[in-house]
Amino acid sequence: IDLIDKSKEVILFVPGAGMDHRVANLFDLNPKLFNKVISIDLPGHGGTPPSNASTIEEYAKFISVCLEELNLTDFHLCGHSMGGLVCMSLASLNRKIFKSVSLFNCQYPLFVGSALLDGSSRNLDGAADFLTKYGIYKMPSIEKPKKAFGIKGSSFYKKTNGKVITPYGFKDIDNPEREIALYDLKKLFNQVSKDILAVDMNACMGFRMDIKDINKLNDINIIIGEKDKLVSQKK
C-alpha cells in the first residue's frame, strides 16, 4: 500500500472461487496510468489463514475491514465470478468509496451444478478440469521443455500417455500437451485447505441479496466473455 502512486489509478481485484492474489499478477495494464493491481486474499486463500468465513457476505466483510485498516478509498473495484458476488456485497455496504465497480463473467444468482459441487469436495483435480474446460477458450502458450525440466517435473515431457504429475498428485491423461498448458493455471486452485473450492462453490449457491441492497448497485459494469461456457449471457 505504501508503494501506491496516488497520481495513478488503483484497482482492487477479487478473484474467483478457489483462487487468490496470484490471478492479479496476470493483469497487464499501462504502468503510466495504473498502479499494480491489488488483491486481498480471502480467508483460506493464498497467504491468509483459514477462518470460519464461508459465505459471500463474510468474505465481503473481511475485505471491508481490511480496507478500513489500510485506509484505502477512491479506487476501482472488480471481481471475477465468485469475486463478482463479493464485489456486489461490498458495493452494497459502501458504494461511495469505489470509483467504479466491474463484474467479470459473473451473474446473480450464481448457480453451481451438482457435478461441480460434488467434484469440488471429492475430486479437486476433476473440478479444476471442469472449470478450465468450460471457462478457458484460448489455451495458454505451452512452455517448451528444456534440459532442466524445472518445477513442472520431467514426467510431463517423458510420457505421451499414462500417469503424470498434477498439482494434486498423479492421474491418467489422454492429452499431455493440454495438461502442460493448463498446469500453471490449475495450480491457482491449490490452497492450504483442499476444501476451500467447495466452500466457495457453496458460498456462491447460498448468496442472495435483499432488493433494497440490489437497488444500491447502480452504475456498475458487467462484462461477460462470449466464449465462457460457465456463464449464461441470457441471464
Where are these regions (language model features)?
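Conserved alpha/beta-hydrolase "acid-adjacent" motif
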Residues: 229-235
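Conserved acidic catalytic loop of the alpha/beta-hydrolase fold
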Residues: 58-75
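Conserved HGGG/HGGXW glycine-rich cap/lid loop of the alpha/beta-hydrolase fold
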Residues: 2-49
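Conserved alpha/beta-hydrolase "nucleophile elbow" surrounding the catalytic nucleophile
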Residues: 15-17, 75, 79-81, 225
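Conserved hydrolase catalytic core segment
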Residues: 73-112
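Short beta-strand/loop motif that positions the catalytic acidic residue
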Residues: 216, 222-224, 228
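Conserved alpha/beta-hydrolase catalytic His-Asp/Glu region
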Residues: 112, 117-215
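Active-site acidic short loop of glycosyltransferases
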Residues: 6-8, 71-74, 95, 217-219
